[in-house]
C-alpha cells in the first residue's frame, strides 16, 4: 500500500477500508442525525454490518460520536449534520471528531480506521478536513488510518 500522508499517529493510504487486517477493527464515518444511510460509504457500512446501524443514532445530536457494535467490530457514527441532504460544517466535523477522541480515550481504544470523511458526497475539501483530524488527534496516542480508493 502506498502511503500518501503520514503524521506521527495519522496514516493515509490507498486501499479498501474494509480489507484491513485487524480482528477487532474500530471504524469511524460521517452520518446525519436522521439515520439515513442510503448512499456513499455509509450504505456500505449498513450492507456489511446490518440495518441496526441506522437506528443507532436515534436521539443523538450533531457533534456526537455514536458507537455501534457488531460482533468484534465497532463503528463510531460521527454525526456531522441533521439531515442526510444537508452538508456538514467544519465546526460540526471538528465537534464529532472531538467526541470520537473522547470516547476512544475513555474506552482505552488505540486505533481507528476511517475513510476520507466528509469529502465524498458531503463535498468538503479533503485538505481542510485532514487538518481538523490532525488538530484534534495531534499529540494523542490514538493511531488513525485513513483509507481511500
Where are these regions (language model features)?
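Macrodomain-like recognition of ADP-ribose-binding/processing modules
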Residues: 1-149
